[in-house]
Every structure is written in structure tokens, then in C-alpha cells.
């Protein structure tokens, strides 16, 4: 009599496949990295303040000092935007993330360009500086609007980049109060606003690193 062989029943005691870590967990920033980034931003800001405050002779070439200050400040801004981008401050939407990527690229690219400035022809450098300065400030302002609008970060670090980028309000206020002849006062207000705002932002990264890391 013929017999029919049936396949053995499937095993139910097989160990489960290990779960693959989520991509978001792999991208999460640790509080230590955020604190280190904040400390690096502070160091670069100190370089910016030092070389901006150094007295330069009227008949000397002050470009080197201005260049070092510009590189240091652009790099400090790039660190903040890089942490915000990696830490999820721009959210998951493509539009604001594209803004963050573009701002970081503009800031990092400007820092690299200004770093090689002394070896470039002077005419080319002067023309490029007319583009890089508004590009850096404009890119940072747009990124700061994104951080504030998306709202993934909480606490001072959410609003401080936007306050830093709002330097025209301070400069215009100084001019309105003191008159159009206060060019030097307006310049000091501009530099002071940028330095103070960026310093507070870097301190916020250090002090609030744990909460910022939880949003990444």
C-alpha cells in the first residue's frame, strides 16, 4: 500500500532574528559630542573676538587679522548649524533639512575659502568677500529661522541662533538713537551682537546638551 510523506512541521522554538537598530538611533548625537561642539564654537569665537579687537596700524595690511576673524566666526557658526542638522533640529521634512544642509555648506565653504584667502589674487579676493559676507549671514539667518520654526529643539538653543542672526535690529536701533553719523558705534554694535549671541548659543549647547541629544 503506497504511503504519502508529509513535510515535517515548522519549528516554533527557533530563536528570533535580532532586531536591526533603527537608523535614527544610529544618528543620535551624544551629550558629550554636543558639549565638545559647543566648546569648539566658543574657542573659535574667542579667536574671532581677539583678532577683531587687535589694533592694526593705519598704514599696515590688516587683511590677515580680518581673515582669521572671519574664518573663526564662520567656522563657529558652521559648528552650530552642523550640530542642529545632525541633532534633528530641522525636523524630518525635506524642505527645512535642505535649508540646513545648504546653510552648513555655505558656512563651511566660506570658512575654507577665506582660509586660503592670502594666496589668492587681491582683486579676486575683494570681489569674493563682497559675496561671502552676506552669504554667510544670510544662510545662517535662514537656518536659524528653520530651527526656531520647526521647534524640535527646546530651551534657549532653539531661539538663540535666531537672536544672533537678528543683528540688523541692534544696528538699526543704534543708528536711530544716535544718528546716521555713528558709523563706529554701529560697527561695534554689529560685532558685539554677533559675539554675544554666538557665545550664548555655544553655552546653551554645553549646558543643555542632554536635552538636545534626546531630540536627535
Label every model-predicted segment.
Residues 2-9, 13-216:
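Hydrophobic, aromatic-enriched alpha-helical segments typical of multi-pass transmembrane helices
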Amino acid at each position: 500500500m503506497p504511503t504519502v510523506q508529509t513535510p515535517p512541521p515548522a519549528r516554533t522554538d527557533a530563536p528570533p532574528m535580532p532586531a536591526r537598530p533603527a537608523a535614527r538611533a544610529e544618528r543620535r548625537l551624544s551629550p558629550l559630542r554636543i558639549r565638545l561642539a559647543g566648546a569648539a564654537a566658543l574657542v573659535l569665537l574667542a579667536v574671532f573676538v581677539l583678532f577683531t579687537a587687535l589694533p592694526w596700524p593705519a598704514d599696515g595690511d590688516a587683511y590677515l587679522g580680518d581673515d582669521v576673524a572671519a574664518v573663526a566666526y564662520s567656522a563657529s557658526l558652521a559648528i552650530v548649524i552642523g550640530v542642529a542638522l545632525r541633532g534633528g533640529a530641522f525636523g524630518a521634512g525635506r524642505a527645512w533639512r535642505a535649508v540646513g544642509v545648504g546653510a552648513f555648506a555655505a558656512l563651511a565653504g566660506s570658512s575654507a575659502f577665506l582660509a586660503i584667502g592670502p594666496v589668492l589674487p587681491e582683486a579676486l579676493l575683494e570681489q569674493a568677500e563682497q559675496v561671502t559676507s552676506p552669504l554667510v549671514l544670510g544662510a545662517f539667518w535662514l537656518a536659524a529661522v528653520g530651527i526656531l520654526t520647526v521647534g524640535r529643539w527646546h530651551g534657549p538653543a532653539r531661539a538663540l541662533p535666531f537672536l544672533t542672526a537678528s543683528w540688523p535690529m541692534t544696528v538699526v536701533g543704534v543708528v536711530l538713537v544716535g544718528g546716521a553719523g555713528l558709523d563706529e558705534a554701529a560697527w561695534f554694535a554689529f560685532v558685539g551682537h554677533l559675539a554675544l549671541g554666538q557665545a550664548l548659543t555655544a553655552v546653551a549647547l554645553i549646558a543643555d546638551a542632554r536635552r538636545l541629544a534626546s531630540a536627535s
